[in-house]
Amino acid sequence: MTVYNINLGIGWASSGVEYAQKYRDQSFNEVGIKRKFIFSDLILGNNIGDLTANLGFDNDNIIWLYNFFTDVKISTSNYSLDTLENELNLKKLSSNVKTVGKEVFYQLNDGLQLVARLSDAEKRTIDQVSYVKNNTLLKRDFYSYTKYACEYYLGADKDNR
């Protein structure tokens, strides 16, 4: 038997909801009951694999409806900044690179700016990359061990900042 727990979302354990989910996971584990936790919200602020790992969940027990029908597995963010730089040829195309906090800014010659958000500054892994031109957000890519989602922003300039 497998018990399926249906939830909207998960965060950084900022409320009792996350702890209740973890307690449920531990309780089922102690008595040997297979379990899956289903999350139905579109979770893009942070990688769901990082959020569930923070609480100690086994990612094999996590089902996120937004990638369930793909071959992308739930995983913590381990996509390296070096891989991104190589794939997009950023070292050659960028006229200026600077790091501010957990963000690495690449100024490209055509006025496009890429902003990579570090999920772990020490390991140099990323979880998001934003594409900005003339202070307007155009696109954002989301990463775990691979790119798993992309958002496009096509509204008026004032809506994309």
Where in this protein do the model-derived segments appear?
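Terminal non-domain segments
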Residues: M1-Y79
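Repetitive, compositionally biased segments used for assembly/scaffolding
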Residues: L84-R161
